[in-house]
Amino acid sequence: MNDKNEESIDFGYQKVARNQKKNLVADVFQSVAAKYDVMNDLMSFGIHRLWKRYTIDCSGVRRGMKVLDIAGGTGDLTAQFSRRVGAEGEVVLADINDAMLKVGRDKLRDRGIIGNVRYVQADAEELPFDDNTFDVITIAFGLRNVTDKDKALRSMLRVLKPGGRVLILEFSKPVSATLNQVYDFYSFNILPKMGQVVANDSDSYQYLAESIRMHPDQETLKSMMEAAGYEKVDYQNMTGGVVALHRGYKF
Ligand SMILES: C[S@@+](CC[C@H](N)C(=O)[O-])C[C@H]1O[C@@H](n2cnc3c(N)ncnc32)[C@H](O)[C@@H]1O
C-alpha cells in the first residue's frame, strides 16, 4: 500500500517524513513570531512592503467584499484589505500557527483595525469554510511552507466564489544569472547571521533560504494552478524574479 505519510518530502534541503513537515514548519514560526516583522524589514530592506502593496493593487478588492488572507501571519495584507473592504466587508486572517496569529491580532488591534477582521487558526490544505465563500484569497510567502501544495491550491479554489481570484505572492527564481549569484551569497552567508543576531535563531533563516530554492519556479507554479482548476492564470515577476505574484480565477 502506498501510504502518502511514509513518503519523504523536502524541509529546506533536508528530506523528512511527510507527516513531520508541519511540526518542523510550526517550530520555525513559533520561534520567529516575535521578531518576524522586524526581520522582514531588515532582510528585504523594506521592499516586502512594496510587494504586498502591489498584491493589494492586483486583487481587485472593493468595499463590501469578503477576503481570506491565508497564512496571513502578522497581518500586513489583512490590515490593508480591512481598510479597502470597509465596514460592510470582512477579512479573515487565517494561519496554522497560533503564535503568528497572536502577533498579528495584537498588532492589528493596537492599530485600531477592528470590527471587520476575524482570526481563524486553519491549515491551507483543509480550509474550514463553505464552498464559494470569498471574493479574494491571498497567500503571501506561505505556500512554500505547505506540505501538500496541490491540496492547498484545490482547497483555496473550493472556497473561492465564482468570479473571484486567488493571488499567490511567493519567492521565486531570479531571471538573471548574476542576480541569482548575488542572491545566493546574500541568502546563505548573510541571512542566517542576521537571524542569529536579531532573533537568536540562525536555523530558521537557513530554512528560509533553502525552502525558497526548493519552491516551484514561476512556470511550474503556474502549471500547478492550472492543474488545480484555476483559469486565466498569469504571473508577474518583481525585483527581477526574486518574488513572483501568481493570479488565478474561478469562473
Ligand atoms: C513567511 S510567513 C508569511 C506571513 C504573511 N503572509 C506575510 O506575508 O508576512 C508564513 C506563514 O505561513 C504559515 N503557514 C505555514 N504552513 C501553513 C499551512 N499549512 N496553513 C496555513 N498557514 C501556514 C506560517 O504559520 C506563517 O505564519
Curated annotation (Swiss-Prot):
GO terms for biological process: aerobic respiration; menaquinone biosynthetic process; methylation. GO terms for molecular function: 2-methoxy-6-polyprenyl-1,4-benzoquinol methyltransferase activity; demethylmenaquinone methyltransferase activity. The keyword Metal-binding does not apply. Its EC number is 2.1.1.163, 2.1.1.201. Pathway: Quinol/quinone metabolism; menaquinone biosynthesis; menaquinol from 1,4-dihydroxy-2-naphthoate: step 2/2; Cofactor biosynthesis; ubiquinone biosynthesis. Pfam families: Ubie_methyltran. It is an enzyme of class 2 (transferase). Methyltransferase required for the conversion of demethylmenaquinol (DMKH2) to menaquinol (MKH2) and the conversion of 2-polyprenyl-6-methoxy-1,4-benzoquinol (DDMQH2) to 2-polyprenyl-3-methyl-6-methoxy-1,4-benzoquinol (DMQH2). NCBIfam families: MenG_MenH_UbiE, PRK00216.1-1, PRK00216.1-3, PRK00216.1-5. HAMAP family: MenG_UbiE_methyltr. This is Ubiquinone/menaquinone biosynthesis C-methyltransferase UbiE. It comes from Idiomarina loihiensis (strain ATCC BAA-735 / DSM 15497 / L2-TR).
